Amino acid sequence: MKPKQPKQSLHDRLRAARNELSRRDFLSQAALLTGALPAVGYLSHFDTAPASAMQSTAAKAQANIQGKIASLRNRVISAEWEISPKGLRLIRVKDGTSGQTIGEQGPAFALLIRGDSGEVVSSAMKLIGSPRVEMLEANPAASRFCERVNGRAVSATLEDVRHRVRVYWRAILRDGSHYIRQEIALEAIAGDLPVDRITLMDLSGRGPEVAGSVKGSPITRGNWFFGLEHPLSASKVEGNRATCSINRHLPLAHGKTATYSSVIGVTDTGQLRRGFLRYIERERAHPYRTFLHYNSWFDLGYFTPYDQTGALGVINAFGRELREKRGVVLDSFLFDDGWDDHNSLWKFNSGFPHGFAPLRTDAAKYGAAPGIWLSPWGGYDGPRKQRLAYGKLHGFEESSDGFVLSGPRYFRRFHEVCMDMVRKYGVNQFKFDGTADTSTVYPGSKFNSDFDAMISLIEDLRAAEKNLYVNLTSGTYPSPFWLRYADSTWRGGEDDSFTGVGSDRQQWITYRDAATHEHVVRSGPLYPLNSLMLHGLIYARHAKRLDTDTGHDFPSEVHSYFGTGTQLQEMYITPSLLLGPDWDVLAEAASWSRRNADILVDTHWIGGDPAKLEVYGWASWSPRGGIITLRNPNKVPQTYALDVQSAFELPEGAAESYSARSPWKNAVGTPSVKLRARDTRIINLKPFEVLTLEATPR
C-alpha cells in the first residue's frame, strides 16, 4: 500500500508547496507530501519524521512582545494580546491561511469569587513585573507528543486589585501546531479563596455550536474549535456568545495553586474532525498505539477469585498460540476482578503468594507485562459488598456510590497500591472501573471530586512509567479531554448484551456497535473512536450465550472489531475454546491492525444506526491509503452507497482514485474494486456480512 518513493527531495517538494499555497491549508498539504515517509506510529499522516511540516519554517512557532502587544504565530495560526499595567486582554486570533479573524474579544480569562458582585476579569487586573517570551525546549523522552517538539510561549503575572489571587498566565504555541493553548495557574495569596468558577473562553461571533451533549464537549465555529481542556468543563452557546468554564467546589487554599487550560485551533475547510483529532493526538497523555491484550473477565474469574496457576496458564496459552506460533505482538495480560482478597483493601488473595512477580516473568517471555483491574468505588455485586464492609470497619471513606477516591484515607491507600503495582510488579496497564461523585466534595479532601482525585493519581502513575496504558471505564463519557489523562474511556451501555437479529454473536456485535453509535457517535461527535473501550472480543466460558460459536460468526466479530480502529484491543477469551482456524483469524486481524495503525488512528463512523439494522461501519485515511469496514446487521441483503470523497473525508490535494481489495487470506484472488472520489459505488452486502477494504491510491 506504500506509494513509490518520489524522485524529488522532500525538502524541495515542501518548499514548492509553500510557494504555491494560497487558500490551501499548509498542514494538510504537507501531510500529503510526507505520506511516503516511514510512519512514526500514531501520527503518521499528521506528523512524520525526520522532516515534515511540523519541522518546517512555515510551521515554526514565533513569539514577540513589542510595547503592550504580545503575539504568537506561525503560518497557520496567530494570536495577539494587549498586556499593560491595567491588565491582559485578547485582541484577536487569526487563521493564517484564509485570513479569517476572530475579532477583538476582551478578557483572556475571568474568575467568579464567592461573595463578589461580579467577575474578576484579566483586563482589570494589575500586571506584576514584565511580560516574557519563553523558549520551550523539546523533550524527546516525553510521553505527550507535543512536548517532544520545540515551542514558544508568552507569559505574564497578574493580581486582582484586592490582592487576593495571583494568576500566572501563559499562551503556548508548539512548532507545527494549528492551535494555541492558554494556561493559568491560580494562587491564593491572602488566605483561602472561594473561587467558584473559572472562564477561559468567552468569544463572540456568528454560528458557534457545542459539539456534543456531554460535559467537556468542545465548541466549534466553522473551521475553528475551542475548549476548556477538562472533562468536567461546561461549554455553552447563547446566541452568538460561546463560553467555556469550569466550577470549583473547594476554596483555593492559601499558598496553593490550581492550573487550568484551554485551546483555540483552526482547521482546513471540511477537515474539522481530522484537524481536531490531530490536536488530540499531539496533546493527549500518550499518543495512539495498538494495545493487544488478554482480559481474565468471563474466563478465569466472573465475580469469583482465581489464582496464580490459572493466570500463568492463560499467559502461556496465549503466548504459544499468538506469539510463538503466529508471530503476533502481545502487549499485556490484564487480570480483572478476582485477584484480590475481598476482606482486605486491594491486597492479593492467597492464590498469589508472590503477588504478580511470577506473572511478570512469564509475560516477559512473550514481550508483554501484566495489567490490573482496580475499582475506585469498590467493584460490583458480592465482592463489592465484602470490600465495602471491610473498608467501613477500618475507617475508609464511603458514600452511597461506594468508596470515595477523594477521601484522604482511601486515596492514600489506593495510591499506594497502584504505585506498588508499577514499581514492584511491572504492571503496564490499569483498568480503573468505576469513579463517582463528580461534583461532590468529601469533607477534609484536597480534591474537588473523585474525578479530580483520579486525575491526580494518573499523573503520578505516568510520572513513574511514561508508557503506562490507562483505561477509565464506568463513570466516563465521550469528552475528548479525558484523553489528556487516560488512554481510553468506556463506550457506554452494558458490558455485553444482545439486540437485533441473527445468532447470539451477531446480536452481540450489533449491540456493541449500537451502544457506540448512541453514546459516542451521537453524544460526542469529536471524541476519537480510536480511544474507546468497546468490551473487546468475547468468547469465554463464563460469557452467557458467547461461550460457543455454533454459527461460525467469530471471524465477523474479529474483523468488525479491529475495523473499529480502537487501540484498546481486549481479548475476553478462554484459550481452550478456540480452534486452530479461530487463532488464525485472530492473529491475522491483530497483526493487520498493528501494521495499519497509521491509518486506523483516523477511524470515524460511516453509515447508519446498527439499532435500526442499517448498514454501518468505519473509515480511516492517510496519504498512503484508506480502510473501509462495512457491516450488514440484518438477515436480508442490503446495499451501501460508497463515495470515498465523503467516506474518507478527503482533504484538498489528496489522491482521488483508489484500488480496493480485502486484506484477508480467504479473499486472495478476489478482484479489486475501483473507487473514485465523487463517484458512488454500490456495495452489495449479504446478510451479516462484514466487508473490509484496503484502498491504495492509484
Task: Set out the residue ranges of the language-model regions.
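Active-site groove signature of glycoside hydrolases
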Residues: 328-339, 415-444
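Active-site-adjacent "subsite" loops/lids of carbohydrate-active enzymes
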Residues: 302, 371-425
